[in-house]
Amino acid sequence: VKTSSLGDIIHALPALTDAARAIPGITFDWVVEEGFAEIPTWHPAVGKVIPVAIRRWRKNIWQTIKSGEWRRFKQSLRAEKYDLVLDAQGLLKSAWLTRYVKAPVAGLDQNSAREPLASRFYQRRLAVARGQHAVERLRQLFAVALGYDLPKGLGDYGLDVERLIELPRNKPYVLFLHGTTWDTKHWPEVYWRDLALRMGHKGIEVRLPWGNPAEKARAERIASGLGNAVVLPRLNLAGVARVLASASACVAVDTGLGHLAAALDVPTISLFGPTNPGLTGAYGKVQIHLASDFPCAPCLQ
């Protein structure tokens, strides 16, 4: 059970790779927020994806019950006989979902979980040290829960990158991942534009994806009048993954798509202000973190 967000879901993939190598033939069914349901399908160790819509259901609980959607979700959880349920999120909302599966439940103990009360829902409560990167914490959780030795070295996301790369490859380009959720995570538009201009002087094309009207407007402002900057059409997650996989490099703020770039082994410079890259930064090969040197950073606000 790892329902959200985009970055958190991507962080769980190396743990699945570890488990699949340690226990040949193991498969995972994954409970995930409906908007991110495509991501688990990219990993070969995932059998079935069970979408959940907590974000949408909260807006109209009565309609969720009346429509039968909640009943069908519970039925899907009970449709299979599992050896173990692993709450990889450590939140009350994820722990609550484990109640509907008829199998032993494992998760983080009260000193390890983000929400300590979540541990009350588990039969097996496992200790995983805080103060380390989220990917490594998840790798340790899976290893302890499933009883294998944690592999040494950098985790492997297990994605088939070659399947996503567009062939034949067009001319090289750099992707700007400028959209993020918190206002404090944004990089000033004037800096984005200056960087695009400098890349233009070196003959490098810049592409800008977007996911909502505000991001589209920002992308258009950054690209305005620059011959080397291209605002992409709106893409779904798989479309963005294809564009990322074919990119020569990427510049990103702290955003879920930045973690996807890392998972696809795209050389990326990630910019961090209020968050701590040591705990939740882009994890992978050729990843560079530039963090704010403000005295208050990382304030997590």
Where do the model's predicted regions map?
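Catalytic machinery of carbohydrate-active enzymes
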Residues: 1-301
